[in-house]
Structures are given as C-alpha cells and as structure tokens.
Amino acid sequence: MGCQFSVNSKKVRIFDTTLRDGEQAPGIDLTVEQKVKIARKLAELGVDVIEAGFPAASEGEFIATKKILEEVGDQVEVIGLSRANKQDIDKTIDTGISSIHVFIATSDIHLKYKLKMTREQVLDKIYESVRYAKDHGLIVEYSPEDATRTDKDFLLKAVSTAIEAGADRINIPDTVGVMHPFKFHDLIKDVVSVTKDKIVSVHCHNDFGLATANSIAGVMAGARQVHVTVNGIGERAGNASLEEVVMALKKLLGYEVNIKTYKLYETSRLVSELTGVPVPYFKAIVGENAFGHEAGIHVHGVIENPLTYEPISPEEVGNFRRLALGKHSGIHGLKKLLEEQGIYLNDQELREVLNEIKKLAENGEKVNVDVAKEIAIKVSSKKIKV
C-alpha cells in the first residue's frame, strides 16, 4: 500500500503513531475500546497509516491491534510494531495484520549498553528479521532506532541491508530529538540516495522543540512519509504534531496530504479527552488561542479581513476565532462583540464601556462578554435589542 508515493511526488503519507508511540507517554493508558475509538477518528481524518500498537508487548496490545485492524483495516493501512526477532514478528502476524514496523537500534550507545551486540550482529539481525517478515508476505517498514546518533556510514549500511532484505520503506527516527533542520535535511538526503526509490519516512521527537521543523526538513530532503501523533503526545517532550506537520506541508510547502483538515480540531479534542492530556492553550492549529485576538489593532484588522492577522482560517482546521476583551482591546472589537449580543451603542458609550473594561483588566480581573454586556447596559442611553 502507498507505493504510488515516489520520491519526486508532491504527495506525503501521514503515518499516525498516536496509539503506539503516543500511548507510551507516562500516564497514558488507553483501553481497547478507547484505542478503537481513536482509530476510527484517525481513519475518518484521512491518515494513510495507523500504527495500532506493539502486539508482542502485552495481551492487551495484541487484542487492541487485532480489533483496530478489524474496525478500520478496510479504510487505512494498519501496522504493528515489532522488534527484530522472529517471536515478535510471529506475534504480529497472528493479529492478521499485513504491515509490520520492524526496528533495531544502530547507535553505538544502544549497541553497547542495551543490545550488547556488535555492528555485524545488528546487520545480521536486520537482514534476518526483514527477510523473515517479507517471506511471510508482509509489507515491511524498517527503523534503525537512534538513527541520528548512529555513525553515518554504518547507518547507511544498515539501511542498505534492510533494502537488500526486501524492506518496502525505511524510517529514520530522531529517537531523542537531537537533530536540527539543517543537519536532518542533509542526513535524509544521504539516506534517500541509497534507498533505491523506496519510500523514506521520518520520525522526530520534540526534546528541543524541533520535531515539526525537522519533519518538514526531512520531507524537503526527499522523505515522503512522516510519523506524527495527535497533539504531539509521546514520550518525554512528545513527537511531531500531526496537525502542525499537515498544515505546514500543505500551506507552506504545497505538498498534498490526504487529511481532511477541517476535522483536525475535533480529532485533537477526542484524543485529549480520552488520554486525559490537555491541549496547550497556545498550541498551534488546535489550541484555544490559536485564533484568539485581543489587541485593538489586531481585532480591527481581523474584522476587516481575517488574513491581516491569521495565516489560515480557523474553519479550515475546525477551530474557532475568539475575540477577547482586556486592557489591549479596542473599540472595533468591543463593538462587534456587543452587537453580536444585540447591544448597539454610539461611539461615546462604547468608549465609556471600553474604559471600564480596561480598568478591570488592569486590576487583574477577567473580562468576558457577560461582564462587558453588564457594563454596556449600565451606560447605554439607547434601547438595547436582546
């Protein structure tokens, strides 16, 4: 599936790992039913791949992966994570899945302290596991874990070994988020050069706040698949955010994605509700303040033409525009908010209301529309339409 996405294509696959890497974050433990509910929403959203889980990790993961495959497998590619060994691969096969994500680390620090293996042994594992999965008819995506801290020559050798064994896709994980966009671009360009037209994917963590930027840099270097999570949830500082990556690819670079962007906000809120992880107030695209305005100059501009202070419309991502009241407010925004409540004031009355609002705000009080309405009623000299 997805092989039509060539290196020279303007199409980019969205590989969602909310249900696998996202759920690995401490404190996030989803039931099978909750995972299925999110999977349905992701399929509805239009992601190309759903990483349903790690079937060999637990019976619950096995059952969830199987159930997700049954529920949405006819709409979207469902993939399961597996270590590079036959036992894990067999367990994944037992779910009925047709796609597998095989990984083994390649960095010296992982080889020495975690795997206790030599580079030669790792290369053998890569070949054997990928070949075994291919011999069982699976679509195989291979990831060299901790790729960005791996000696580059050895990384390229590991990638080439996976391709020789039959891997369909190569995913490059920035496992601990140590890349910056310029360096990651160069690395992905080198990986693309040895992949023989196979799809290259990127998987970026956000330890330095660069997961989205690095993901975009990877695509600019030739990657045609991006691993993401809804709201950027995941281990430590999280993963590349689905909503940020999708909108940056589409609006800033002109790439094609299958995502129904008007469903981004509702998907974000569903994941937040089920995981118990709140969406940051200032979160790009789906945050409550992503399209919020208070400053008088900004509000005036947005009222006249939203593009003056918004790069995209909130409707495009299913979000909402919010005009706030406070010490930075201006008369145009106040007038619009009051008229939406059926209150029509002249300029003198509006200025009196605005002065009262600013006094309250400067004293640390929160001013909402109801408060503004009360003030307006007190100072109004006209009939109020309510």
Curated annotation (Swiss-Prot):
Record GO biological process: L-leucine biosynthetic process
Cofactor(s) in the UniProt record: a divalent metal cation
Binding site for a divalent metal cation: D21, H203, H205, N239
Entry EC number(s): 2.3.3.13
Catalysed transformations (reactions): 3-methyl-2-oxobutanoate + acetyl-CoA + H2O = (2S)-2-isopropylmalate + CoA + H(+)
Domain called Pyruvate carboxyltransferase: residue spans: 12-265
CDD domains per record: DRE_TIM_IPMS (cd07940)
Stored PROSITE patterns: AIPM_HOMOCIT_SYNTH_1, AIPM_HOMOCIT_SYNTH_2, PYR_CT
Secretion signal, residue range per the UniProt entry: none
InterPro entries membership: 2-IPM_HCS-like, AIPM/Hcit_synth_CS, Aldolase_TIM, IPMS, LEU1_arch, LeuA/HCS_post-cat, PYR_CT
Pathways per UniProt: Amino-acid biosynthesis; L-leucine biosynthesis; L-leucine from 3-methyl-2-oxobutanoate: step 1/4
An annotated Gene Ontology molecular function: metal ion binding
Family, similarity comment: Belongs to the alpha-IPM synthase/homocitrate synthase family.
Subunit and interaction comment: Homodimer.
Record PANTHER family: 2-ISOPROPYLMALATE SYNTHASE 1, CHLOROPLASTIC-RELATED, HOMOCITRATE SYNTHASE-RELATED
UniProt protein name: 2-isopropylmalate synthase
Organism in which the protein naturally occurs: Sulfurisphaera tokodaii (strain DSM 16993 / JCM 10545 / NBRC 100140 / 7)
Gene name per UniProt: leuA
